[in-house]
Amino acid sequence: MHSYQLLGLAAVGSLVSAAPAPSRVSEFAKKASTCTFTSASEASESISSCSDVVLSSIEVPAGETLDLSDAADGSTITFEGTTSFGYKEWKGPLIRFGGKDLTVTMADGAVIDGDGSRWWDSKGTNGGKTKPKFMYIHDVEDSTFKGINIKNTPVQAISVQATNVHLNDFTIDNSDGDDNGGHNTDGFDISESTGVYISGATVKNQDDCIAINSGESISFTGGTCSGGHGLSIGSVGGRDDNTVKNVTISDSTVSNSANGVRIKTIYKETGDVSEITYSNIQLSGITDYGIVIEQDYENGSPTGTPSTGIPITDVTVDGVTGTLEDDATQVYILCGDGSCSDWTWSGVDLSGGKTSDKCENVPSGASC
C-alpha cells in the first residue's frame, strides 16, 4: 500500500473517533433543552429555547414582571421553592404566561407568595396604593396548569384570556387579608375566552371566587370558596366582548361569603348571557344573598333600576342549598321587562335569612 493511502486511512480514522456517539449527541441535546432559572431576567430572556423549565426560588425585582409569555410550544414549566416579588406601587402583572401546549406545575412545597399585605389598605383597586395584578394567563392555548399554590395577592389573583385551558387543583389563599385590609382579591377573572375548565380550586379571599365577564364553554367544578363574594357571572357589559355563553358551575361549596350564586349585568349596556347552569352548590354563612340575579349595575354598584340590553336566558339552577345569616336575603331577582326568560329552577333549599319583597320581572320557572 502506498504511503499516501496509509495517510488517508489514518485521517478517516481520526475523524470517526472524533465524532461523538449518537447517544452522546442525544444527551447534549437533552441538556440544552432543560433549563433551571434563578432570576426573572434569565427566565424571560431564555425561556423560548427550553422545553423543560424550572423556576427555582426566583425573587422578582420590584416593578418587574416574571414574563414567561415566550415559552416554547409544548414546554413544561415547574415552580420550585418560594417565588417572591419586590415592593412597588404599579399595575403589574407580577407573572405573565403565554404559549401553546404548555404544562405548568409546582414542585412539592412550592409557593408563589405575593406578600400582599404590603399593598393592602382596604381599598383594593378603588383608591389608595396602586396595586399590581398578580397573574395573567393570556394568549395561552391548549394548556394545563395544575397544583398551583398562590398566597396573598395584592389584588386580583388570576386573569384568564385563553383558549382550551385546564386549571386544576389551584390554591389561592388570601385569608390573611380578612383582617388586614385585603380587598378586590378575586380568585379567577375570565374574559374573552373559549374553553376554560377549572376543577378542584380552593379560594380564600375578599372578592369573587370566580367572575366570568365574557367568554363561552367555561366550567368551574369541585371548588371550595370562602370569605369572598361567591360564584359570579359579571358584571357583564361595557367591554369589547359582552357575551357569556355555555357556563357550568357545579359541585362546589361557598362559605362565609357575601353571596352564594350571582349574575349581574350593567345598566343600559348591551350584550348577552345565556346557557348558564349552577348545579349542586352548597352554601353556609352567607351574609348578603343566597342567589342574586340583577340587571342594574352601574359604576360597580346596583342602582335598583334594571335595563333590558343584556338578556339573561336559559338559566338552570339545580340544587343550590344551605344556610344564610339572619340579615341575608335568600333570593333576589331584578330583571328588566321581558329580558329574563327560559329559566329552570329545582332543588333550591335555603334556610335562614329572609325573603325579598323587591323582586321584579321574575321569569316563569324561578321563584323569589
Swiss-Prot record:
Keyword tRNA processing: no
Keyword NAD (UniProt): no
Enzyme class: hydrolase
Active site, renumbered: 207 (proton donor), 229
GO BP of this protein: cell wall organization; pectin catabolic process
PbH1 repeats by residue range: 140-161, 162-192, 193-214, 244-265, 273-295, 307-352
Subcellular location, record wording: Secreted
Enzyme Commission number(s) from the entry: 3.2.1.15
Pfam family, one: Glyco_hydro_28
Entry protein name: Endopolygalacturonase I
Lineage: Eukaryota, Fungi, Dikarya, Ascomycota, Pezizomycotina
Gene name, Swiss-Prot/TrEMBL: pgaI
